[in-house]
UniProtKB/Swiss-Prot annotation:
Cystine bridges: none
EC number: 2.3.2.-
Stretches for region Interaction with SUMO1: 13-18
Protein name (Swiss-Prot/TrEMBL): SUMO-conjugating enzyme UBC9-B
Active site: C93
Site positions for Substrate binding: D100, K101
């Protein structure tokens, strides 16, 4: 494991514990021996107030590679969400999470989670990852929002 990645992730954890957005969760997982695994985080993103996502708490796994922060983490909703920019596997499709697009090593875990929360209510229809959600979002917004509200209710804490 890269010393640079672990050092940066330890800093991220410290910063998060000191100050993070209300309702969000970001915690490194534990290894079988009880030690902390800074390369694998369990996160949760609350649905934004005043949106169909409100009331839901959406669980997300953040996996870091040894070359972090040169490369972005993989962010995956568990279980996968109904959303135009979430692949059927649960992986989030967002430009700041793509090395060849908008990823920069200075981007923090907090910024990633806030960016994903923003994406939930404001899908990028130029970059769809899930055909069904994309089609319903484009063709029947009322039905789309109904499904999102049902999903938020299902994942309420």
């Amino acid at each position: 494991m890269s010393g640079i990645a672990l050092s940066r992730l330890a800093q991220e954890r410290k910063a998060w514990r000191k100050d993070h957005p209300f309702g969000f969760v970001a915690v490194p997982t534990k290894n079988p021996d009880g030690t902390m695994n800074l390369m694998n985080w369990e996160c949760a993103i609350p649905g934004k107030k005043g949106t169909p996502w409100e009331g839901g708490l959406f669980k997300l796994r953040m996996l870091f590679k040894d070359d972090y922060p040169s490369s972005p983490p993989k962010c995956k909703f568990e279980p996968p969400l109904f959303h135009p920019n979430v692949y059927p596997s649960g992986t989030v499709c967002l430009s700041i999470l793509e090395e060849d697009k908008d990823w920069r090593p200075a981007i923090t875990i907090k910024q990633i989670l806030l960016g994903i929360q923003e994406l939930l209510n404001e899908p990028n229809i130029q970059d769809p990852a899930q055909a069904e959600a994309y089609t319903i979002y484009c063709q029947n917004r009322v039905e789309y929002e109904k499904r999102v509200r049902a999903q938020a209710k299902k994942f309420s804490p």
